Amino acid sequence: MARQSGYSAAHETRPRPLFSPDHHAFREQVRRFCEREIAPQHAAWEEAHGVPRDVWRQAGDHGLLCCWLPEALGGPGADLLFDFIVSEELGRIGATGPGFPLHSIIVAPYLAAHGRPELQQALLPAMVRGDKIAAIAMTEPGTGSDVAAIRTQARREGEHYVLTGQKTFITNGHNADLVVVACKTDPAQGAHGVSLLVVERDMPGFTRGRNLRKIGQHAQDTAELFFDQVRVPASHLLGDEGQGFKYLMQKLAQERLLISVQCQARAEAVLDWTVAYVQERRAFRQRLADFQNTRFKLAQLAADIAAGRAFCDQLIAQHLAGGLDAVGAAAGKLWHSELLGRVTDECLQLFGGYGYMAEYPIARAYADARIERIYAGTSEIMKEIVARDLLDR
């Protein structure tokens, strides 16, 4: 059974004042692309553990990549809402494989904000076209969420940095043509010694390990990366040396907001699939939808999802106005990742044994959802951030 793409739900008809008529027209364009080019192929990509590169170029041809990027940097000059629409529409069909949001919303901003003009012109227009795929590499074996403890080092030698180290769990890692790498240029300085370097595919000494096998999100390319004395031009340093940790923290709210957006959209989709299923499936001579237990569960989930939508749109509005801080982003990431986990668990239960079968979208959604409470900061870290703000005022 392929992932379902039908979509007729109450949350689709509720007004969302954030979005203009141009946004709505773009959403229809993205929806058609997702239903035509992604939904029918996604199961095959999960079997292959990756998305073909030509899909990225198709996305670029349809204007789905780096929508927010200014025209001066090779982008269409729209706003970030267009990129969030792409994320929502991928979530709507349960497509976790295409790494477009990370490429557009997480990686591209580092290049736009801190890249040298020559580097920007060489890479950003190609990212918009889908000719170059981007990744960011922070996580290392043994460091988890502690960026200040990374061991990958870069030593300055003339007009180059010599980069040595290892990264793991890197989304888009196998397909990536460029990787923003967090490394230590001054290990003695801790967090103040972290810098960001852009490593390109063809640089000698840059290799990729295995495409990591995960319990979910199988179509998403996740890799180990190795840097063995890679000579990176000094012009590929983003911003100033030793400022990498600060740059990462500045962009973290946007990364966590993206996870809220994706989780909310996927929770809505899972509820839609389940509402359709319980109206068709019969047990004990009646529809599942006629059992009070089913109706009560769906009602509670619908209420939780409606609250999540209001919260998510509030966070987006705050971010667009420049007012989303680390605490708000952490609270959102905590709420929406936990919401998705709860929704997929409750809905899978209503599917019964069929929900445990991998060919059903609900089973894949259940496995796909688990990582959301881990990456970009675990739920425990999100709680700590929010609690500190409450208790240390």
Language-model segments: residues:
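Short glycine/proline-enriched turns and hinge-like loops at secondary-structure junctions
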Residues: 78-79, 146-148, 172-176, 190-193, ...
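A short core secondary-structure module
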Residues: 159-160, 164-208
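Helix-loop "lid/cap" segments that line or gate small-molecule binding pockets
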Residues: 105-114
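A short, Trp-centered hydrophobic/proline-enriched beta-strand micro-motif
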Residues: 130-138
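Alpha-helical interface subdomain recognition
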Residues: 1-93, 97-99, 114-119, 126-131, ...
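Short Gly/Pro-enriched turn/cap motifs at secondary-structure boundaries
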Residues: 100, 127, 142-145, 169-172, ...
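Flexible, small-/acidic-enriched active-site or ligand-binding loops
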Residues: 149-151, 202-233
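Conserved hydrophobic/aromatic beta-strand scaffold that supports enzyme active sites
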Residues: 135, 149-153, 160, 178-182, ...
